Each structure stands twice: as C-alpha cells, then as structure tokens.
Amino acid sequence: MTDPKRIVLNDDGWIVSQIMTPVTTAVLKERIVDTYVDSGLDTLSWCMGDTGRQRYETLDILAQPNYLPQGRENDLAAQNLRRLIDSDGGPVTIFTKLCHEIGLKFLPSVRMNSHYDRAVADDVGSIRQDHPEYLLGQADEEFVSNTTQWGIRTGLDYARPEVRSHVVALVIDLFERFDTDGVELDFMRHPAFFRVDEAYGSRHLITDMLRRIRARMDEVSASSGRDLEILVRVPPTLADSARIGLDVETWIREGIVDTVAAGGGFIPLHAPVEEFVEAAQGTDCQILGAIESLRPATEEESVNAIASRLYEGGASGLYLFNFWHKSADWKRRVLNVLTDPDHLSRATKRYEMEYMERLAPNDLHSYAFRYAVPPVQLPVGLGFNLTGRGTVLSLTIGDDIERAAADGEIAWCTLELGFSDISAEDEIEVLVNGVPLPSETATRRFGTWSRQEWTKFPDRLAEVDYDGGVIEYELDGPPFRKGENEIEVRTIMRTVMKGAILSLRHVELQIEYDG
C-alpha cells in the first residue's frame, strides 16, 4: 500500500465579502470548515488579506472598538470582520479553533503582493495610500502601456527595507499571537516584487527577509512546543522564481522553508515539479504540486490526471487553489481519491495540454501572472519541415498504460487533436513515441469545434469556437508509457492554395479503466 499524499487547500477569504448572510462563527463552521470533514484534507490555508490590506484581527483593529474604516461603514467585509472580532475574537482565532477541533492544520495565508488598478480599487491598504513612494512605479513615471513594468507598477517594491520590515511584522504576528500551525507566504498572489530589470539581482533581499521570519518562528516553536511550518507558493520553475527575485533553491537548501507549493496551477501538466523535488533531495523540505480551479482542472477527470502527473514527478502532495467553492460531497469524493495513489491509479483521467491563450493579460494582476509563468507548447503552427520531421510535443503522464493494457484493465483510451484552419483535404500523420497511429480508423470532424475556456478571470467559463476540425484516435494497445511521451504531428499534404497556417490548438488524452 502506498503512503497517503498530503493535501493543502487554500480558501481565498471569499465568505467575508461575498454573501449577504451576516458572517458568524456558526456560518464559518457550516459553510467552510465542516465541508472538509472526512475529506482527507490535511491543511486548510485561509487568505487573511495581502501585505497592503488585511481582513483579520490585527492589533490596529483590536485597539479601536467598534471601528470601521472610513467610507466603508456599509462594506460587507468590514461589517463581518467587526462582528467576528466582537463575538469570538476574529477570523484567525476562529479558524484555528474550528480546524483543530476536526483534526485539520490551519495556516493563515498572506498574499505577498497585489497590483491594483488605481482607477477601480477602493481600498488598497494604508501602506500604499500613505507611502506611494513604496510602489514599483512612481507617480511621475510613465511606462509603455501593456508592458510588464506597466502592469506591475502598483505593487509594493520589496527593494525598500520599509516594505520588507512591514511584511516581517505582519507575518510574525500570525504565528506569534495565534495558535496557528505556521503561515503560508503566497508568492503567486501576485508574482512581482521588484522592478523587472532589478529582480534577479535583488533575490537576496527576500531571502534575508525569510531568514528573519524563520529565526523568529524557531524561537516561538521552541518556547511553545508547537510544530510550526513556513509554506511558500512560488512560480512553476526554479529559473522563473529566481528571475523575479525568489531564490527558492537557497530557501530549500538552508531549511528556511518547510514546504514549497510549486507553481500557480496555471500550467500544472507542463510545470517541471521534478526540479523542485531534486532541489529538496537530502533536506526535510516537502514539495507539493499546485493545481488551480481553472480549465481544464474544473472536472474530476482532469484533476485526477494532473495529480497523477505531479505524483509521477515526485510531489509528496498537492496544493489546491480556488477549490473552496466545491460542495462537501465533491470534497469528500475527490480529495479522498487524490490522497490515495493506489485508488488514483485506477481513476478515469483526462490529460489536456495547456495553451497560451489562458495567460493573456486582461487586468493588472494578470500581467504579474504572465511575468512569472513560462510559455507552453500550444498553440503551435504546423508546416512542412525541411528535415521531414514533424512538430514534436511532450506529454508526461502518471498512468502505467503499458502494464494496464497488458493486464486487460483499460476500458478505452483516446487521443484527440483539435486544429484551426484544417480541412478534409489536409493529410496529417501522428506518431506517439515513434509509433504511427492508424489514420484509417481515426474519426474526423470538420467545421466549427469548441471548447470551454476561462476567457477572463473571474468571469467563469465560456465556449470558444474554432474554425477547423478535430481528429480522434481510439488507441488499442496504446503506445503511451508512464512518464514522458513524445507526440509528433506531421503535415503530409496541405490544401492547395490554402494561405492560413495550420495550427494545432488542442491535445487531449483520455483513459478509462475497467471495473
């Protein structure tokens, strides 16, 4: 029997500002904590705000009875925060108690930066309002619109010692004054901390800041007997982390952090979790693979596939973001599968390769995401290569298809490719690990095809149409293997006088087991 995997789930604090029902301790218990009973969840992290504005019982708020921020007397979040403080001490106090009562660990989560649009943000926190000189872009500076530096200009600049001191005090308060199990530092909300041209050379500054937090945590742990944890969520590669000023390898090597959630969950199949696992070899640092509730990870089959791939890469568990909205039934059903690798190995899976359109900037925060997340393989243009070799894509899977097929355990397995600007006259050849797929048994559909895409966060899903076609292969004795696989797509014949480039936009492998 394989050891169970650890699951950490982040709740973004939605309930304080998003429901009309007055938020009380009973509501937090019923709507949040109790939904994880018997789910297999190990740790709940709850967003208490960011480094600019907080929604918990800070010392400043506690010192002002009946206080509501000026101009926010009718603000739901402010009213609910005041109510929770006056009744039972406040959100961090309440969540710590409720989680411990059902055997969950609790980590308050700090969003390490935010890049607000000044034109629409009504509350960006006093540090930004009182000290605009602490921001990544100064009021008298002009940036070229829609560039990375323009997009991150409203975030706090960690090159300023005042900013780092402010963050240290905020973070230490969360494990020093409360009976929490440590703290989560979420560097993926939102991942820009220095000016673009200064970030790599400034990475020692955040490392120094974390050393200070680690030192104080060790002191608190020694004096209280509590087992405290620093969990960090970082970009999906070590190189991208370092490029934006986060020296994750040093944090792991020096024991500054206990757990690393690798990636924001935007490209979980493509993210090289293996390099984090390798960096943690010989240390006590735990590596979690990150999944966010974005397409394709909105459906159980896709979540199963991503988890299987991350475990294949050596992850000791998962970090789930924006799955708080799922029902208690979903959490019990799905999370218990994810914690059990043996059960997961036989679960239905859909491996859907990520595509670049999902990372297109549409607000200031998304510029930071695009800044920290590397490009992926789709979409890709298909042409006539001079060497005769086709376009090659890599897909890593966690399923031992070869063994399962040999044992007669696979009910069906299909590979689906979606193209734009393809027609019935075009001839395509597909090879998997050098084995040609039988084109004569493939199913072809031409015309408009669609898929669900997260077109603009947080506007939910929408059907996006493509003019082209889909080719689907039913795989009997699938040539896929556990680990990395090579999918080669060759253009054999193209429609005469067709000017548009043939583009591969969608690759999906589905596996269902017998029993």
For each feature predicted by the language model, list its residue ranges.
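Extended extracellular/luminal ectodomain segments enriched in beta-structured repeat modules
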Residues: 403-414, 423
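Aromatic-lined carbohydrate-binding/catalytic grooves of carbohydrate-active enzymes
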Residues: 41-86, 192-196, 262-276
